[in-house]
């Protein structure tokens, strides 16, 4: 970062760079940072104050590292359970989303009055609300009527009360409801979306940041200021083809933001500050607190303390560190430090390795019966992802391999505790039927999530999380619900806001 800033300082105009990061879960593309629980996990806490505290942690770490813009928070609503990006939302309730989006912006920007020298710029996305994808398929046209458009838009209206530095229209969907160029153009290339609605109807005068993969010239002419994914060749072509008055207008907004951030005075990072702030123990503990508070019990029958029991840990996801967070991070394949961070590792640490047996996904290793005082902790759900969910958008049903493990364990008579890594609202009926207890942990975070899960299982913390969305009983229910309408599944298996509270698991 400092090297790039030094090159800028030596250039003719000396204009510093503002680095941005797709940091929806902390400064997560850099190792040794605090990777926070995903937004849907925080939605289950119902705690906007906690969201602000976590956003402030992200601000501290990003600022220390020299990254002064975060492409977060996500102000979308999870109104269709099939959509793969539901994990980035705070759930399907508009009031919860408003409170948490406002809290996240406030934490990132260090206040409610816009950006200053201690801020990280917040880029709220994806305008005008990208939750209602046709059929739940990412990149399909957005579905609205008058009532639901106002509902989804209301999250952004709430966000504007605390003056986010930037707004990002969605780059992969059209908005036919709005008419005009929004019928054919993606939202970040649409004048109707950016000028008529965002600047006109909502009165927004800040920076419009595009998504990635676009026609940069069309986007700028339509109203965008910052072009996502633009390379040097694109810049040269744009300068040659765009009206200079447009460039002047866009540069004015960007320079004003840089002056407010104070990067003209000091664009450099400090190694001592990085060592003190990034990945600190204090930040670890706060991330763990959030993951613990989100844990949601939806079934809880005849449980005894796990202390002293023989523990079977079942399922490949129990050793999959990446699955503890969404895909918006450095991965184990690209350098993520994973040692000691899986759910299996955390259970071994808490119970003692001699009391734990790992079965993985080989159901032939499951015995016909087990001694009394044995519990199987079965970790199920989807692997980590970003836009496209691991199971695809056509189904929310657990794969046969995971269902068979649960059924065979249930038949053995062992106590079965299902731990569900949940990035979407799955069809939970087979898990409920084969388990004595069902604990949903969402995406608890690579940094502290595994330890938080172990704490919840062994009664080291209270369990109080509430579902941030409805849980369907069947795929037929999913197919009958509307993409744009929240809480419209009739007779769900578990309803929005449900969660069994216990002072300690097993007691």
Residue ranges and their predicted role:
Residues 1-507:
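Glycoside hydrolase catalytic-domain context in secreted enzymes
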């Amino acid at each position: 970062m400092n090297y790039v800033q030094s090159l800028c300082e030596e250039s003719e105009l000396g204009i510093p760079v503002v680095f941005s990061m797709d940091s929806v879960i902390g400064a997560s593309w850099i190792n040794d940072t605090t990777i926070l629980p995903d937004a849907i996990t925080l939605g289950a806490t119902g705690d906007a104050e906690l969201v602000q505290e976590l956003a402030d942690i992200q601000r501290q770490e990003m600022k220390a590292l020299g990254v002064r813009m975060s492409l977060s928070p996500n102000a979308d609503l999870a109104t269709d359970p099939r959509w793969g990006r539901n994990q980035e939302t705070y759930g399907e309730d508009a009031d919860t989303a408003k409170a948490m989006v406002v809290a996240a912006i406030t934490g990132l920007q260090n206040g409610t009055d816009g950006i200053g020298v201690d801020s990280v710029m917040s880029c709220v996305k994806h305008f005008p609300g990208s939750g209602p994808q046709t059929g739940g398929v990412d990149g399909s046209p957005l579905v609205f009527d008058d009532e639901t458009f106002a509902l989804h838009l209301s999250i952004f209206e709430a966000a504007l009360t605390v003056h986010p530095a930037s707004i990002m229209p969605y780059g992969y969907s059209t908005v036919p409801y709005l008419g005009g160029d929004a019928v054919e153009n993606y939202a970040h290339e649409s004048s109707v979306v950016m000028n008529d609605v965002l600047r006109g109807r909502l009165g927004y005068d800040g920076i419009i940041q595009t998504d990635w993969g676009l026609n940069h010239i069309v986007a700028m002419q339509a109203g965008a200021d910052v072009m996502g994914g633009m390379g040097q060749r694109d810049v040269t072509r744009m300068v040659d083809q765009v009206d200079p008055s447009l460039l002047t207008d866009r540069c004015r907004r960007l320079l004003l933001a840089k002056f407010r951030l104070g990067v003209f005075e000091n664009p450099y990072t400090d190694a001592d500050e990085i060592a003190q702030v990034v990945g600190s123990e204090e930040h670890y503990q706060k991330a763990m607190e959030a993951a613990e508070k989100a844990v949601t019990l939806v079934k809880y029958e005849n449980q005894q303390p796990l202390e002293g029991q023989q523990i079977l840990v079942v399922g490949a996801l129990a050793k999959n560190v990446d699955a503890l967070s969404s895909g918006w991070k450095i991965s184990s394949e690209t350098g993520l430090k994973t040692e000691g961070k899986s759910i299996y590792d955390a259970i071994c640490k808490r119970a003692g390795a001699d009391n734990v047996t790992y079965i993985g996904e080989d159901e032939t290793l499951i015995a016909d019966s087990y001694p009394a005082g044995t519990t199987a902790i079965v970790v199920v759900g989807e692997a980590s992802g970003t836009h496209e969910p691991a199971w695809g958008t056509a189904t929310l049903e657990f794969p046969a391999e995971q269902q068979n493990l649960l059924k065979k364990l249930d038949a053995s008579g062992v106590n079965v505790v299902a731990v569900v890594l949940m990035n979407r609202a799955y069809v939970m009926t087979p898990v409920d039927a084969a388990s004595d207890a069902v604990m949903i942990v969402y995406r608890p975070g690579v940094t502290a999530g595994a330890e938080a899960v172990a704490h919840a299982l062994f009664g080291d913390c209270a369990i109080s999380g509430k579902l941030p969305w409805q849980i369907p009983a069947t795929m037929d229910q999913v197919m009958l619900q509307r993409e744009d309408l929240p809480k419209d599944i009739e007779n769900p298996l578990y309803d929005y806001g449900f969660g069994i509270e216990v002072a300690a698991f097993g007691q």
